[in-house]
């Protein structure tokens, strides 16, 4: 089946769906599934915007609320993970995953699902070492600190994913696995993003947690975003089992949805034609969730996961066939994920904006039902219970410096002509001074992007299909990995009905008939400096 993979969404759902539909018509093909690698921005109303780690002057409603309200329906089944620019309060309602809108599914803090027999896993957020061992203690309204820590990866999710033993077809993370750039062409990467050089040379770029998962899970495909550049790599894993064929992972990072950027790619993935055309639970993952329910931490205190070091009576929480059968019984032998989306808050009304709306802590019925069926802990219900009983010590003051104060209506205006911009057009400034120990990118993000274009009127070129082989050139080779992808896919033909495959970019200078012209609504958001670390 054909899977469309998208990098950073940044709320551009309409543009992404329109692009796919245009390409389906142009190429006479059908995309079966869309995967988004973070920064999805499922913003339902003004309160959600205040829970997104973006400066107030750059916040814009976008159009997700139309999918949430039912005014629009996602034309393609969409699965996404969270990034570092999200409506964290909404995603927090669904820690184990769930429908954020009809036909749009969030994986959760971490999760595994199946579609047509293809096993798809993912982990949300980005890595920051100072929050890694904490629990999920944050709750809205967030403070200036918790609005960022809410999307930081926790060790419980990594520990759970490391219990998996069955083969993984696709895995998604927002930030890159650390060291993956050594398996692709670093020369071309640094030509595009020279401010990564020191971190690449020091091997500090990317997430060590994701790198750990890559070595353990060894999926066939790994997709990421976050760094706003397309990069392909091929990693051959090692095996200690004699006679066993080593696994290999095709890694692909994609850009964000902007003009002249490679933000979308079609991947042909083998599937089981006998499997139903719906999302299904993964029994092994559910068994791991149930086995590890007592390891949950809802405070900001640090918490170590069990290890085989003589200090823990149990450290292996992997799923046995018996536990998977028990899970199947709990589900009534129906592993189809129910389409039980429900609205949990009022939707944005452009005719009656509520700028003083503040996000509240909500327990989502989807999570309640899921936990009841499997005997799991509803994190939000547990936090609320402890708050009501007065026996929870969050230690991080959610009320002090709350970002949920009333704001002037002008902050949501689409007129951005007066906004100041930095010399780097790529990024969104978070305006904080958090430490840079994990990724250390902020001081270099002031450099201009070599491929930026300010054009606002665009249409689209054709799409590239990821080839079966992603041979990686050395740093000294003339052609990079991406160049080889170009050569394998861009053979131009002249006969009628033939297709010319070129990188998918949102172009400003293509005016052929049949193109879809799209005008940017929020260009100024991406003309400001972004502290990617947060």
Swiss-Prot record:
Organism whose genome encodes this protein: Xenopus tropicalis (Western clawed frog)
Assigned GO CC terms: nucleus
Cofactors required: Fe(2+); Zn(2+); Mn(2+)
Family: Belongs to the lariat debranching enzyme family.
Gene encoding the protein: dbr1
One biological process term in Gene Ontology: mRNA processing
UniProt protein name: Lariat debranching enzyme
Domain of life per record: Eukaryota
EC number: 3.1.4.-
Family matches, as Pfam families: DBR1, Metallophos
GO molecular function, one term: RNA lariat debranching enzyme activity
UniProt-annotated stretches for the region Lariat recognition loop: 124-154
Compositionally biased intervals (Acidic residues): 388-400, 428-440
Lineage: Eukaryota, Metazoa, Chordata, Craniata, Vertebrata
Sequence positions that bind a divalent metal cation 1: 8, 10, 228
